[in-house]
From Swiss-Prot:
Subcellular location per the Swiss-Prot or TrEMBL entry: Cytoplasm
Annotated Gene3D superfamilies: 3.30.1360.40, Ribosome-recycling factor (1.10.132.20)
Gene behind this protein: frr
UniProt-recorded name of the protein: Ribosome-recycling factor
Native species: Oleidesulfovibrio alaskensis (strain ATCC BAA-1058 / DSM 17464 / G20) (Desulfovibrio alaskensis)
GO terms classed as biological process: cytoplasmic translational termination
Main location: cytoplasm
Molecular-function GO term, any one: ribosomal large subunit binding
Lineage, broadest ranks: Bacteria, Pseudomonadati, Thermodesulfobacteriota, Desulfovibrionia, Desulfovibrionales
Annotated keywords: Cytoplasm, Protein biosynthesis
Keyword presence, Protein biosynthesis: yes
Length: 184
């Protein structure tokens, strides 16, 4: 039963970590290298992440700089950024690609908060699905007479505690991201 609980906790941790990654891709008013991590460049016929083709830096809170190692990749990187759904406009000076982050409008901020809430809801659903799987495993153990009914109840209580903790953690991550998005 301990292995089920450990496995459950590990899977729930991964669900919240995935939420964190999704939030990293959400654009706030602040520049972040994680914004361009999800952008793939068609480099010699292979979709390649920007951070594998160039050094990505944030010199100030409103600018991202991208310096491709291969001079031939400048146009490809620029094209990939423009085609992404992030609404970013790259400026290529031949040596470096700069992306200036325009301030977000109030309307756009509210849209981003809605998206963040959707991501959080998806993470909570994932956590609850993991709970269901764990409870099914525990019930199966009881049915196979590997554990007693009391142990089954105790195990299900532990799984519920884990679920509550990770749902609360998701809410905390959302509150932090919401504050960051609404910050002017």
């Amino acid at each position: 039963m301990d292995t089920i609980l450990l496995e459950t906790e590990e899977r729930m941790e991964k669900a919240v970590a995935a939420l964190d990654r999704e939030f990293g891709r959400l654009r706030t008013g602040r520049a972040s290298t994680s914004l361009v991590d999800s952008i793939k460049v068609d480099y010699y016929g292979t979709p390649t992440p920007i951070n594998q083709l160039a050094s990505v830096a944030v010199p100030d809170s409103r600018t991202i700089t991208i310096q491709p190692w291969d001079r031939g990749a400048f146009a490809l990187v620029e094209k990939a950024i423009m085609q992404s759904d992030l609404g970013l406009t790259p400026i290529n000076d031949g040596k470096i690609i700069r992306i200036s982050m325009p301030p977000l409008t109030e309307e756009r901020r509210k849209e981003l908060v809605k998206v963040a809430k959707k991501y959080t809801e998806d993470a909570k659903v994932a956590v609850r699905n993991i709970r269901r799987d764990a409870n099914e495993q525990i019930k199966k153990m009881e049915k196979d007479k590997a554990i007693t009914e009391d142990d089954m109840k105790r195990g299900q209580d532990e799984v519920q505690k884990l679920t509550d903790a990770f749902v609360a953690k998701s809410e905390k991550v959302l509150a932090k991201k919401e504050k960051e998005i609404m910050e002017v």
